[in-house]
Every structure is written in structure tokens, then in C-alpha cells.
Swiss-Prot record:
Residues 125-180 form the HTH cro/C1-type domain. Keywords: DNA-binding, Transcription, Transcription regulation. InterPro entries: Arc_TR_HTH, Cro/C1-type_HTH, Lambda_DNA-bd_dom_sf. This is Putative HTH-type transcriptional regulatory protein YG5714_1269. The keyword Acetylation does not apply. Residues 136-155 bind DNA. It comes from Saccharolobus islandicus (strain Y.G.57.14 / Yellowstone #1) (Sulfolobus islandicus). GO terms for molecular function: DNA binding; DNA-binding transcription factor activity. Pfam families: HTH_3.
Length: 310
């Protein structure tokens, strides 16, 4: 984590009086979440001076999609007015771009492997087209694109080039232009979990995932933050599960940071304990704990839940 960029990010947040928490686990390795911002919806922030890894992006995507929010990667690699879309709900911005996001300014340009596009508000496009009496064919002819392209625009399956955006503004006005981040949040799309065969059969985490899935629970595995799993039941209640590791001090740190993450993402934290010493300590601290040889109790807890906010 770049100290220079993180200080810029913190200055921006404190200037706007946002509340936030720093996630300080793992301490000496790469991690996927540096800051959780408590805005209207919790926002995850990863600060990086270089490229983020696939595993970091994977964690950010899973947490963001499961919590119906955004993950922002703040890096000097991005241009001020352009967002880079890394995955569903994961967006990379420059420190200047991050300031615009926090100030509520609209950022409508984004970059993908296919080029630079402008975000449009598909529902406004359809409403205005129908209100003004244009057929799909009329708009397609005016823009110089296919009828299928207009269908895709109106369904939100495709955005537009700079040239097409200018023509749309001429026809329908500039309120048709959207915000790359907040108009792109996806919540209903399922994030497909890795195949269980990708994990080591000797791994406790792998066995746990298998048992949870066997009981009809939806599981997402995290690799570079304080929580090990995101678990959702059929009623969409959300849990963060974290597992004790071999080092006592690191485990205590991990649990503390996972508690912060669960609080800001409105999830319930469940801790799996592997030693008797840790069990007593965690119970004294008020953590909800389960022993590794008593996973059925954890499953009963999750499947028996109802009415909790997700």
C-alpha cells in the first residue's frame, strides 16, 4: 500500500467528514481491502501504486456484488476523468477521480479492453425515445448503428462510443449520460464460486466449503482479507466466516479486523476456532465461535436464521 496515495485518500475522506475504517490484515502481505467507507452504502477501497492482482480483484468483486455496493481501486495508473472497469462492481480510479467520486461528481468515461466508452442511463434512453415518439429504427438511423445496438443500449447491455454519445445528447439531452460507478452496480448477478476441486482436499477450508455447499448454502471464498468466506442462506442473510490460523497473535488480529469488516458490510461474523485456548479468549471477547469439529452447529445457526438484514 502506497503511503502517499493512502494519505491522499484519507485526506479526501476526512475533508468530506466521511466515517471509515482501515482494514489492517494481513499486515505484511498483499491484501484486497485497505479501507471500508461508511457512506450511503459501504464502499470498499484498495489503494495500490502498482497493478492489483487477479486475487485482489476477485475478493473485491465477491464482497461488492454480495453487498450490492462498489469496490474502488485507487491508483496512479488511471487518468483523472476515466474509470477503468476491472470486474463487476470493481472500478479503478486515480486519486483525483476518487475525489470526484467522493464529491458526488459524475464520471461518465470508462475504459475496458475494447476501448473508451460513455455510460448511458438506459432507462432514460428508452423513456425519452418513447415519449418523443421515435421508433427503434428511427434512432438507429440517426445514430448510424444497428437496431440491435439500440436494443442493447436500452437493456443496459451496452454503452456507447464518444461519437454516438454526442448524437444521443443532441437528440435526447445530456441527462441521458450516466455515472460509471453508481449506475453500474450489479447485485442480482451471481458470482460463481471456484470449483471445490481447485482446493486441496487436506485443507480445512476446502472441507468446510464442501459441507456448507452440501447443505444448500451459497459460498464465496476470499483469499486476501480478514474473512475467509462469505456465506448466504436462502433468505439472503449474509455471514462472514473467519478461521483461526496457526499463529495466536495473527489470529487475534484477524478476528478483530474481520469484526470491522462485518460491521461495515452489515454481515454477521462467525469464527471457527481450532484450539481450546483460543476458544476461551474469543468467548470472553464476545465473538460468536464454533469449534472446527462442530461445524454442524455453525450450519444450524446459519440455516436457522431469519429476519436479519442482508
Amino acid at each position: 500500500m502506497s503511503k502517499k496515495i493512502i494519505n491522499e485518500v484519507i485526506d479526501i475522506l476526512e475533508d468530506k467528514k466521511y466515517t471509515y475504517t482501515m482494514i489492517e490484515y494481513p499486515e505484511h502481505n498483499r491484501k484486497s481491502v485497505d479501507i471500508v467507507l461508511n457512506s450511503k452504502e459501504p464502499t470498499l477501497i484498495r489503494v495500490s501504486e502498482d497493478k492489483v492482482t487477479k486475487e485482489e480483484i476477485s475478493d473485491l468483486k465477491k464482497i461488492a456484488v454480495s453487498t450490492l455496493t462498489a469496490s474502488l481501486v485507487v491508483t496512479n495508473e488511471e487518468e483523472e476523468d476515466i474509470v477503468s472497469v476491472k470486474a463487476d462492481n470493481v472500478f479503478a480510479v486515480s486519486p483525483e477521480g476518487f475525489k470526484k467520486v467522493i464529491n458526488g461528481e459524475k464520471i461518465f468515461l470508462y475504459r475496458t479492453r475494447g476501448g473508451i466508452f460513455i455510460k448511458i442511463r438506459n432507462y432514460i434512453l428508452k423513456h425519452k425515445r418513447e415519449e418523443m415518439g421515435y421508433s427503434i429504427g428511427d434512432v438507429a438511423k440517426f445514430l448510424g448503428v444497428s437496431r440491435k445496438a439500440i436494443y442493447d443500449y436500452e437493456k443496459g447491455d451496452s454503452d456507447v462510443s464518444l461519437e454516438v454519445a454526442e448524437k444521443l445528447i443532441d437528440l435526447f439531452g445530456d441527462d441521458i449520460i450516466g455515472d460509471v460507478i453508481w449506475d453500474s452496480i450489479k447485485g442480482k448477478k451471481e458470482v460463481i464460486e471456484e470449483d471445490i476441486t481447485e482446493f486441496s482436499p487436506e485443507s480445512f477450508k476446502s472441507k468446510l466449503i464442501y459441507k456448507l455447499k452440501e447443505n444448500g448454502l451459497n459460498i464465496l471464498s476470499l483469499k486476501l482479507t480478514a474473512a475467509d468466506l462469505i456465506v448466504k442462506d436462502n433468505e439472503n442473510n449474509r455471514y462472514l466466516v473467519t478461521i483461526e490460523n496457526k499463529d495466536y497473535n495473527k489470529s487475534m488480529k484477524k478476528f478483530y479486523e474481520a469484526k470491522k469488516l462485518s460491521s461495515y458490510t452489515k454481515s454477521e461474523l462467525l469464527i471457527i476456532i481450532r484450539t481450546s485456548k483460543m476458544l476461551k479468549e474469543c468467548e470472553d471477547l464476545g465473538y460468536k465461535t464454533y469449534e472446527e469439529n462442530d461445524i454442524h452447529s455453525l450450519i444450524d445457526e446459519i440455516k436457522g436464521s431469519n429476519g436479519r438484514q442482508s
